[in-house]
Amino acid sequence: MVTMKDLLECGVHFGHQTRRWNPKMKKYIFGVRKNIHIIDLQKTLRYFRYTYNVVRDAAAEGKTVMFVGTKKQASETIKQYADTINAPYVNYRWLGGMLTNFSTIKKSIRKLEVIEEMEASGQIELLTKKEKLMLTRKKEKLEKYLGGVRHMKKAPDMLFVVDAAKEKIAVAEARRLGIPVVAPLDTNCDPDVVDFPIPGNDDAIRSIQLFCKEMAEAIQEGRALAGSEEGEATEEVTPASEAEKQEVLAEAMSEEGDALQESEVVEEEEK
């Protein structure tokens, strides 16, 4: 379990500039250094250990914890630790309705399965060069958005979120469904929207790695207590019908201009 030394070495105590704070975080702040809010690590340690136990107990009860973190410094770490414990994750972009309209998300996952079946059977090689290209592009896009949730059978029981302010849509959807949210809270966050807050730096890579590592270990420990080491089990994929294949192909061909449009959206977001 996390120690004070871990927190200090990973810079968990460094908050944002004082002008970028949320006054609701005042009780978690130790002081100010060079116009930077310093988080009270005594409180961080207490909240961290409590939340670790909450997540461990949830995993012991067979509950599913989804990892969410889409910003650059969190994306790879979220995937890395979620993959080690076979947990669902979102690390590229949160699609609206990912929780509240999960049935639609499942339909998109089905399209990914259909394309993969066409590849495995060699049927994709019988298509024109353009059709094959467009299907491949669609597969890559679906994998990017949904690869981390493709084996989920239902909405998760808990969310672990890195940067609750950035992932406000995910947090709002979870709250609407009564799904508890666990999150490190930087000094610019609103603690009222998180069920199990851990005051701490949610921007530094080492800090993010520490949070993800501890949550993954809590889940592993919980599963071990329950005598289960497995996460989301892969289910047998239903063979695709010819109608499904034609529908996915037609949709892929109609998205010819989407690749350019998406790159423009990403560029705009990064400005």
Curated annotation (Swiss-Prot):
One of its GO terms (molecular function) is structural constituent of ribosome. The keyword Ribonucleoprotein applies. Residues 223-271 are annotated as: Disordered. Pfam families: Ribosomal_S2. GO terms for cellular component: cytosolic small ribosomal subunit. Residues 253-271 have a biased composition (Acidic residues). It comes from the Bacteria. One of its GO terms (biological process) is translation. Belongs to the universal ribosomal protein uS2 family. This is Small ribosomal subunit protein uS2. It comes from Wolinella succinogenes (strain ATCC 29543 / DSM 1740 / CCUG 13145 / JCM 31913 / LMG 7466 / NCTC 11488 / FDC 602W).
